[in-house]
Design a protein with these regions (language model features):
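His/Asp/Glu-rich metal-coordinating catalytic cores
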Residues: 1-100, 106-117
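Hard-cation-handling environments
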Residues: 77-198
Length: 198
């Protein structure tokens, strides 16, 4: 049986029951398991019990506390940086984190939380991130958490906002007259990264 691992769109835990003679054993296998109360995706479905558990465990030696206020922290960073005339660059994994950042930035812009800089542009420099985002937008709404599901059902795209610019092939990159780069290709962090410029 597959259960929702809540890590990435479509991620699953696999529950297997094996019988040998009169003895039945349950084995659960999973890669990463997501956190609860994250935006966009459903929380991971708990596994009631198992005889053997095989799971990715990068953070398996600690308990996660309450989820930080990412929207508040990001708002503060954007506000302070824009007030100084700066640019915010956010290195992000192309799948999962990029969509989460888009979700947060849409919320920040929708609520007008960055004062005096309402129309700031956001550039996502990653064709892979753009493809992943389009897959998120095509998935059945039952794969989304209740808040994102309600946004989609009410006609709101939770991963798009005014001022969002996505990367284009490098031969189409050009600088605009006012000097703002249309496309940034100079930040690379880890495998399959995306970079944001706001």
């Amino acid at each position: 049986r597959f259960t929702d691992a809540g890590h990435l769109l479509g991620s699953s835990e696999v529950e297997l029951w094996l019988t040998e003679g009169d003895v039945e054993r349950k084995i659960v296998f999973s890669g990463d398991v997501g956190n609860v109360d994250q935006p966009i995706l459903n929380d991971p479905q708990p596994v009631a019990e198992t005889d053997y558990l095989v799971v990715e465990s990068t953070y398996g030696n600690r308990l996660h506390g309450e989820r930080p206020d990412y929207v508040g922290a990001l708002t503060e960073i954007l506000q302070q940086t824009f007030d100084r005339g700066g640019t915010v660059v956010i290195p992000s994994f192309a799948v999962g984190r990029t969509q989460e950042m888009l979700y947060f930035i849409r919320e920040i812009k929708e609520q007008g939380r960055v004062h005096g800089h309402d129309g700031f542009p956001v550039y996502v420099d990653s064709p892979l991130a753009n493809e992943a985002t389009s897959i998120f937008l095509q998935c059945p709404t039952e794969n989304l958490d209740p808040e994102a599901r309600e946004l989609v059902r009410s006609g709101v795209n939770p991963l798009w906002f005014e001022g969002l610019r996505t990367s284009v092939p490098s031969h189409q990159c050009e600088c605009r007259a006012e000097g703002h780069p249309f496309c940034q290709r100079n930040v690379r962090c880890g495998a399959y990264p995306a970079s944001f410029k706001a």
